[in-house]
């Protein structure tokens, strides 16, 4: 009889734990059902990276002094700095600079410790290629400025997702005339400009 009661007690505990696990799992599922989608229809839509996004490195050849600080602070000694010593000026003369983005971990140490700020992180993340050797960028390729997602006319940024009407989850086919939760960046800019103009008018005409 005692063994039977123990089996019943164990069965009840297992059933209770199973129900608890199911509740926890479904609570996460239902919680995500109320959230907005985070996926986009790439490449027709692109997410706008944050201001501190660490994308492809931009390099300015004219500012570089070939100090090789970027090489020393890089965890994998990635940047290749090709220079020669100028005997007349007794200074380093930079010949070539390259970074292999197939190996780069985008930690940003080279950008942070560069004494002349010749390196900077961009918002470019489209580095996919069929040949890994194409990811080895020289100083010419590094010097090209990437296409800004916010000004790229060939794509539709998902910026409006944060300004959808209340209760709308799908950003597609939303009429522009619908009342939105917040103002679009262009509307905020126009409002700030109008406020600035009004202040200037009041300052120029204090009697009005």
UniProtKB/Swiss-Prot annotation:
Q: State one molecular function term (GO).
A: NADH dehydrogenase (ubiquinone) activity
- Pfam families from the xrefs? Fer4_7 (PF12838)
Q: What is its EC number?
A: 7.1.1.-
Which cofactors are named for this entry? [4Fe-4S] cluster
Membrane topology, as annotated: Peripheral membrane protein
Q: Name one GO biological process term.
A: photosynthesis, light reaction
Which NCBIfam families does the record associate with it? ndhI (TIGR00403), NuoI (TIGR01971), PRK05888.1-3 (NF004537)
Q: What name does UniProt use for this protein? A: NAD(P)H-quinone oxidoreductase subunit I
Encoding gene, per UniProt annotation: ndhI
């Amino acid at each position: 009889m005692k063994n039977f009661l123990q089996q019943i007690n164990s069965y009840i505990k297992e059933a209770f734990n199973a129900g608890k696990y199911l509740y926890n799992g479904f609570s996460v599922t239902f919680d995500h059902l109320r959230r907005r989608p985070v996926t986009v229809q790439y490449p027709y839509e692109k997410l706008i990276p944050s201001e501190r996004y660490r994308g492809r490195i931009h390099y300015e050849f004219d500012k570089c002094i070939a100090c090789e600080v970027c090489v020393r602070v890089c965890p994998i000694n990635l940047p290749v700095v090709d220079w020669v010593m100028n005997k007349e000026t007794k200074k380093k003369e930079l010949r070539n600079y390259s970074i292999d983005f197939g190996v780069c971990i985008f930690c940003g140490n080279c950008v942070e410790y560069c004494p002349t700020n010749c390196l900077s992180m961009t918002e470019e993340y489209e580095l996919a290629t069929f040949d890994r050797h194409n990811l080895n960028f020289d100083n010419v390729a590094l010097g090209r400025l990437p296409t800004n997602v916010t000004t790229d006319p060939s794509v539709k940024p998902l910026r409006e997702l944060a300004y959808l009407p209340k209760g709308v989850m799908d950003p597609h086919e939303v009429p522009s005339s619908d009342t939105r939760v917040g103002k679009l960046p262009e509307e905020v800019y126009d409002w700030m400009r109008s406020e600035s103009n009004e202040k200037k008018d009041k300052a120029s005409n204090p009697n009005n």
